[in-house]
Amino acid sequence: MSDNVVERGMRYLKNNGVKATLKRIKNGPAPIPPKNNLLGFYNFVVNTEEIPFDKKAYEEAKKSGKITLNWVIPEMSPGSGGHTTIFRFVSNLEKLGFHSKIYLYMSPTFKDNESIRSFLKQHFPLLDERVEVYCDVSQMGFAHGTVATAWTTAYYVRRFNNTISKFYFVQDFEPYFYAHGSEYEFAENTYKMGFRGITAGDWLKDVMRNDYGMTADSFLFSYDDKIYKPKEKTDDKPRVFFYARPVTPRRDFEL
């Protein structure tokens, strides 16, 4: 067993106690309660138990001189566009000398580190191999910055204090994923948690700043010009681009 595994195990023991640690060793990461178990499913929203600052880990990080980032992400499917953008950012940061560690949050599928690492290697080969990947946030330790990447992950980052700075990587206005009800409010509430925003495009940046008082910066939309190339124009016929996505209510497909 590597020293790194031992350190993570001791950290989990320190933060969660003997009983929880033994249960995790036996069962792996805790399963997500079904949605009809209302209190269990939404426990992550009301859970305010803080993960404390580890001064010893901070001092060790100062000695190393390397800046580290924790990225808390939801589970993904092959080819997920949002995750592709995250992994592209993470990989470029790695090349610039910022070391990233990725942690899944509330994953129903990946119960060990090897399974998620193999999945990413197969379906997201663009991810820099130096980036560390873990199946669950229970293994997460100190980092100079910790980044929430979806509204569900923001609730965990809110109580994760083993870090210096907290960021929110916002790629969409997530309340619009839902009808105007509880989940809309849960998602919207994360914009008021005091994180520094990094948004996809200026519209989201302006919404975060003007409507929620968030300090935010944006990045412009881009494409991979090694894959996507403009075709030569052959005529002057007007054409309409129709973006159709029936499975997403906010796209107004029926209209």
Model-inferred region functions:
Residues 28-141:
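N-terminal pre-catalytic "stem/leader" segment of glycosyltransferase-like enzymes
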Residues 152, 156-157, 177, 193-216:
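A short, active-site helix/loop in glycosyltransferases that binds the activated sugar's phosphate group
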Residues 85, 91-94, 101-104, 210-218, ...:
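Conserved catalytic-core segment of nucleotide-activated headgroup transferases in glycan assembly
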Residues 134-142, 180-197:
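Membrane-proximal helix-turn-helix segments that form the acceptor-binding/catalytic region
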Residues 46-60, 175-182, 217-237:
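Acidic anion/phosphate-binding donor-loop and adjacent secondary structure
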Residues 72-74, 200, 242-245:
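Short hydrophobic "strand-cap" motifs at the C-terminus of beta-strands
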Residues 1-29:
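Boundary detector for helix-to-coil junctions that initiate low-complexity/charged tails
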Residues 147, 160-176:
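Active-site proximal beta-strand in glycosyltransferases
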